[in-house]
Amino acid sequence: MELQVVGANALTVSETTFGREFNEALIHQVVVAYAAGARQGTRAQKTRAEVSGSGKKPWRQKGTGRARAGDIKSPIWRSGGTTFAAKPQDHSQKVNKKMYRGAIKSILSELVRQDRLVVVEKFELDAPKTKVLVQKLKDLAVEDALIITASLDENLFLAARNLYKVDVRDVQGIDPVSLIAFDKVIVTVDAVKQIEEILA
């Protein structure tokens, strides 16, 4: 199959990478796993056993007229322990390489079908100027975009840093969430070739 390149000849690409059927269930599983892996999971509270304080009974069991109490670390006391204390958790989910690559291929194929993948010969800036980048995107009739290049161009990265709806990644930095988060995905010819090599 062929991908149209802006201002250049069409690029022949592999149908297994850019012409794959849309697999919603697989994409959902991989996106959920990716988001789960990004969770910090470091929350921690103390149970009554872990709270610092005496284990002595505050007053005798009977005869005072007060409610019975075992120690000052009881969860119903101020500064006592937490009943079901949260502990650090690993939220990551296992996704094997075949599934991950399949999801990326499925997303790329759907971007092609929806005309959301814009292929350009090259995409670089002479200086880190946001104004120049905005104009370049206007020329492509794009506002909300993920820009994928073969290697990270520092000028491009710095120019895009101040734009809320624009992100710049190299091929190694793409992930399923960022691919579906933007209206358009601008990708260079060299980046397309790299993606094909990685996903082959």
UniProtKB/Swiss-Prot annotation:
Record region (Disordered): 43-67
Effect of substituting G65D: In strain: S27 and S47; confers macrolide resistance
GO cellular component assignments: ribonucleoprotein complex; ribosome
Homology family: Belongs to the universal ribosomal protein uL4 family.
UniProt keyword rRNA-binding, yes or no: yes
GO molecular function, one term: structural constituent of ribosome
Name the record gives this protein: Large ribosomal subunit protein uL4
UniProt GO BP: DNA-templated transcription termination; regulation of translation; response to antibiotic; translation
Disulfide cysteine pairs (residue numbers): none
Keywords recorded for this protein, A-Z: Antibiotic resistance, Repressor, Ribonucleoprotein, Ribosomal protein, RNA-binding, rRNA-binding, Transcription, Transcription regulation, Transcription termination, Translation regulation
Residue spans crossing the bilayer: none
